Amino acid sequence: MRYLILLLFPLLSYSQKIYSVKYESQSDIKVYVVDYESQSDLKVFKVDYQSQSKGNEGLWYFVDYESQSDKKIYFVDYPSQSDLKIYFVKYQSQSGWRNKSKQHLLY
């Protein structure tokens, strides 16, 4: 039984449901997308299915409606305007926090 749990644990990776708003005043968090991984607070991987949604590990599912979201974000034009700097990664295994002091923003 213990081995079964250890084998299934990686399958239990979850994401958050994110909605991108049009106006800054509607957002929970202001986000800036950086050019380099080393500049980011969070490395984000976009997941394909809503069923993977929960948790706070940089796995994001973008929903179509605000009411479906866990968090509403607004993409800003400059790093100084942001609460959180993110970098989009190519693989799910690369996602995660680089700056854990900002982790509270997505709870």
Across the structure, where does each feature detected by a protein language model lie?
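Repetitive, compositionally biased segments used for assembly/scaffolding
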Residues: 16-107
